[in-house]
Amino acid sequence: EVQKVTLIPRGQARGLTWFLPGEEDPALVSRQQIFAGIVGGLGGRAAEEVVFGEPEVTTGAAGDLQQVTRVARRMVTAFGMSEIGPWALAEPAAQGGDVVLRMLARSSMSERLAADIDAAVRTIVDEAYEVAKAHVRRNRAAIDQLVDVLMEKETLGGDEFRAILSEHVDIGKERRETAARTQQLATA
């Protein structure tokens, strides 16, 4: 659930979206939930391509691309969530951020398995990117309105974000009512 959206630069990021933690059990995450997170992570890059065209895509999504690739690789190598099958293909120590351990794990597998892993990761990310672009195209009017408001205010709270979004898409009764109450308070 979105907590805040801002255009104000933070570190290397030119704008950010903060999410509230979900109510689901973080120890038990489904393939669908992980894939949805990858789709969301590719949203900014997808929006650039849909709105401005592929030649105008910027480096702004570099961190997002690293993150979604890392998550997709874990889907394949740690969670068995690919066409390769339900196998753990790397030792747990090689799943973390240690580059040397990852390189050693990769050197211990066959070239074909390494290529299969790379192909499975690419398939997941490519499919998620197509879904992200479809979401952007389908919700272009909402995105354009959010951009207009963000250009004016620079930052939107989660309820204000949902109030604008609910004018274009069904976000569920409970979220719609909360957003409407917040919008009424903001305009009163």
Which residues make up each language-model segment?
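Soluble catalytic regions of large protease machineries
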Residues: 1-188
